[in-house]
Amino acid sequence: MIRAPRLFQSMISAIGDLYLYKLSRVLFGDSSAIWALFAQLTNWFMFFCINRTLSNSLETVLTLVSLYYWPCLRPSPSAVPSGYRYCALLAAAVACAIRPTSAITWIYIGILELFTTRNKLKFVCLEVVPIGALVLGLTFLLDYLLYGSWVVVPLNFMKFNFFSSGGDYYGTHPWHWYMTQGFTVMLFTFIPFSIAGIVESKEWKLAGLIAWVLGVYSLLGHKEFRFVLPVLPIALMFSGYSLSELGQCELAKKKVNGGVGYRVKHSRKLKMALLFLLVTNAPMAIYMSMVHQRGAEDVMNYLSEAVRDKENTINHILFLTPCHATPYYSTLHQNIPMCFLDCTPSEERVTMDESDQFLANPLDFATRFAQNWTRPSHIVLFDSQENLLKEFLHSHNFSEIKRFFHAHFKVDRELQASIVVYGFRDC
């Protein structure tokens, strides 16, 4: 149950790899397609993120599938089979149903297609509207079955994130963050190759898509790496084109049986580029995927095994951590009461949620919280708060049971070097 969702996501990711290869082959040829796939598989952020069960990962795969079928991106749009555009629209509509912000991508592509296609009225009225209505109707029905009432989730999503800037509740970045930090970190050492690929290929439509998506997302206050994940493979595809150009074989003269023959000489520049990309990306991929912030996984694996133990004493777990800090029930898979600090956004911007209150003053919050709690058998917290709560924990008869490494450096808050499990002891 723990591995199944991740294995399923890895299969979905493989579909994305396939369509990146197919799209690159259509646009740039076989050699570029191979190197585009190399870039996709060796880029540290794709390695780190694409197999995670995030809606952004699925959105990225659907984006690659849809881009492959759009006629406006092909060298000869009129030669594309008529059914391809239906496939493109369907994949785009599903991507928007999963993440409404995916519409940012498809507004750009839709305008390109509108200018490219001959029968604009047919495109809009007989293709876009019916397919969009079908997918939207199915999402309405699914939401009704799950919520028990008619809810327009995409509208609520757009209202919260765009019209009311609700995402700012979780933190903001300067307008240039994607350009100077976010997307540049994601591309990492592939940046010069992507830029070279854009200039050499002159594929301005796809390059424009990257600029459009980054530009629109830059207008929003709340920014995250994963938001622009769908355009990362496109940038890597340009890296593949650049590597292909570097790898053009040279013919070198060589004496053969007394005469003069030729042998293939592979570009030294390509070999140096590949070594550079592997040396810089492989350590990052391994460290970020297997070391950095691993404590959240390790602590839940430990609790999951402890619950199954015959001498199990776990009957209620309290997470005194920032909300959503661990995989929670998706790893535990046992009917054990658990609770974590609430971080539901409030319409009152000045109101602090439980998570913020705890981080602002851990001891004061824990003291007030303990007045009305159902005493847990175990408490999970980070060492940064543990240092302030040791006396509180000991006074309530909790002692340390297990400690797990979490991170070497801080990310968006103070360093959380380890995550600790405390257990209640009967006196």
Name each model feature, range by range.
Residues 201-209, 270:
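Membrane-interfacial loop-to-transmembrane alpha-helix junctions, especially the N-terminal start
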Residues 39, 58-77, 87, 234-238:
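Specific aromatic-rich, kink-prone transmembrane helix
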